[in-house]
Amino acid sequence: MRVTEYIPGQPCWSELATHDWQGAKRFYHALFGWDMADMALPGSAFSMFTLDGDDLGAIYQVPDVAVDNLKTQWGIYFATDNVDTTIARVLEAGGTLVMGPHDIGHAGRMAQLADPEGARFAVWECKRHIGAKRRHEPGALCWVELASRSPARAHQFYCEVFGWDCRESSNSEMRYCEWLVSGEAHGGMLEMTAEWGEMPPHWMLYFQVLDCDEHAARVEALGGRVCVPPTDIPGVGRFAVLNDPDGGIFSVIALRGS
């Protein structure tokens, strides 16, 4: 559906940092049908990815000076009405400031942050650009999910920073929390067990599709990898965790009844 504004705390933008900008553009265009609008930015190659002319997110080339420090990865932005106030809340709650704050021309103001476990996220204060103009439809972001080793600590942190409510889900055998903004679920949180190995806490982005299995097969055909094969979530839909050719991890989900 089309979006004209975001409530503070809602996911509002997704962004891929990649070491293969051209390859990423080809891969995601073939996978989701996204069109790419290249933009000139000092020191980096940058593209907006769009659906029928509506901005959904961005893909950018990791600068050479950051090659050793930044892996190919998807990042999520949450809306805020004041970036600087949000930074202060993050620091007070035990998080860290990773980068910024920066004004992005007349579009808005942003900062990259990390929670107490190191899971990174960004915040966006809209001026002229609200963020993604579509959500909850095929090809668009529909869900974000925090994998945490300390759910109680994460719960306290994000509720203090964004004012989210948390609802325990009854649709899973494992403990699962749904994050609520003004009563609407926009994401979730699960606990990382020993089976996760040394993987650090992180945010996972889910893009909606009509056919999970078809997209998983397409990822492999395009040179990517299936990390978690298509799996049913009772009462919700069918999802898969995927890896693009440069190592960017993301998920797709075909929602029940969609």
PLM segments and residue spans:
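Long compositionally biased, domain-poor regions of proteins
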Residues: 30, 160-161, 185-191, 195, ...
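Short, recurring structural edge motifs at helix starts
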Residues: 1-3, 15, 62-65, 194
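Vicinal oxygen chelate
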Residues: 1-7, 91-142, 167-184, 191-194, ...
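Core segments of cupin and vicinal oxygen chelate
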Residues: 6-8, 12-55, 92, 100-108, ...
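Active-site-adjacent scaffolding segments
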Residues: 39-135
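Short amphipathic alpha-helices within nucleic acid-binding modules
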Residues: 24, 82-89, 212-218
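N-terminal beta-strand motif that seeds the catalytic metal site of vicinal oxygen chelate
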Residues: 1-22, 73-78, 124-155, 203-205, ...
